[in-house]
Amino acid sequence: MPSDSMTDLPETRANAPEWTVSELSFALRRTVEDAYGHVRVRGEISGYRGPHSSGHAYFSIKDEGARLDAVIWKSAFARLKLRPEEGLEVVAVGKLTTYPGKSGYQIVIESLEFAGAGAIMAMLEERKRRLAAEGLFDAARKQELPFLPKVIGVVTSPTGAVIRDILHRLSDRFPRQVIVWPVRVQGETSAAEVAEAIRGFNALPEGGPIPRPDVLIVARGGGSLEDLLGFSDEAVVRAAAESFIPLVSAVGHETDVTLIDFAADVRAPTPTAAAEMVVPVRADLLAGIDAYGERLSAAPRRLLERRRADFRALARHLPTADALLAVPRQRLDAAGERLPRALRANAAAHRLAFEAVRTRHSASAFRLRLARAQDRVAALGGRLQWGLTGLVSRRSERLSAMTARFGSARAASLRAHVLHLSRCRERLSVLSTRAQRAVRHDLRERTNRLAAMEQLLKALSYRGVLARGFALVRDAQGGAVRAAGAVVPGARLELEFADGRLGVQALGEGAPVEPPQAARPSKGARTKAAQPSLFDD
């Protein structure tokens, strides 16, 4: 038996069909695709570097024991709800096939799903750690909410219950202008729309046709972890962190946590709570204003009462008028008692002084003082005579000595003065000659300039024109008439000739009218009629 088998083996190998490499590769491909078709593969994404320049994505899915090549075509990549990320545990749904160029097999992925909530949480923790390392969640970036915003921007779905709750709560507390930027809060485009809405509100110019909000609310109702995943998207987190407008995150319920909560300036547990955070209660503000008004009006009254109490306390410690005037009254009474005695003593003293003065000014005393004065005058006259005689003698001696000294000095001084006068006379003669030449030269120059100016004046003067036979016409006010149109018929004019002036009256356009021949007066007429003036009425 064995010998027979060994004998048939070469024949079997020889009868096997012959395949080309391509035929065998495509046969294996059909076998794999027919045997497995669409599969769901769970594993961790590895080697993902983003889409290729062609738009396709190439990476691997691995677990502890094996690795499977994966590819996502460009058309399928755009439809993915979950984008691949390095290290993300997913369930890949696709078609198993082979790649003849490398003699390997791969999965062509059509969709990706999270491999359970644990995979989602791991992905979110990794994203949170990476964004926190960039400083997007730092407390220093947080902004305070305005106390009373004029305009509130809301990023949410326009048809959900969330926007109705927010508007209702704002209306109850403090009605404000609300601008809603409609977005999808769930689905493939949710994250991109929310990020674009946040950036769109920040891009609104101040004072533009659409008012720029003072505060933003990003809101969504509760949902599963997958439903809220769009608000943990990196684009949404970065847009919230870069917002110049204070932003309140109100996504889900109090137990729901998304990454936008860490990037927002304030996190609200619910959308209704967000509305309560951004505006105060109007009734409470009015009550507070009333309370402040009452306190403000009561403060002056309390201050006035305290001042009155202080004044009354001080007044109680002040002495009475009788107590203040008691001592001065006693002093006044004592002075009143001493006054008559003092007046009598003063009068007696003045009488004694008067008697002494009268005694000193009596006739005998006056004669005695006169005699004494005469004696003193006589003595002084003798002393004065003796002194004058000595003074005249001393001055005569000094005058004689000075006369002798002055004679010689006077002669020398006189000679010096004569010499100085001679030199001055010579200098004066020279200066006089120079001055005469300068005056004559200046006079000639001034005469020449005057003659030139006189010639120029004659050339420019209108009188030169009059001397050539022309006349200057003036109106009744003395102004020059430059055009015939400026003269109305009957106007009085004045003609200025070179030898005098003549008054005329304008008759109108055309040649002048010949005056009538005046009748020759008779020889016997003794007086001539006075010639009428052109300016007579």
Curated annotation (Swiss-Prot):
Any one GO MF annotation of this record: nucleic acid binding
Keyword entries, A-Z: Cytoplasm, Exonuclease, Hydrolase, Nuclease
EC number annotated for this UniProt entry: 3.1.11.6
Catalytic activity, as annotated: Exonucleolytic cleavage in either 5'- to 3'- or 3'- to 5'-direction to yield nucleoside 5'-phosphates
InterPro entries according to UniProt: Exonuc_VII_L, Exonuc_VII_lsu_C, OB-fold_nuc-bd_dom
Region span, Disordered: 508-537
Family: Belongs to the XseA family.
HAMAP family, per database record: Exonuc_7_L (MF_00378)
Protein name: Exodeoxyribonuclease 7 large subunit
Species assigned in the record: Azorhizobium caulinodans (strain ATCC 43989 / DSM 5975 / JCM 20966 / LMG 6465 / NBRC 14845 / NCIMB 13405 / ORS 571)
Gene: xseA
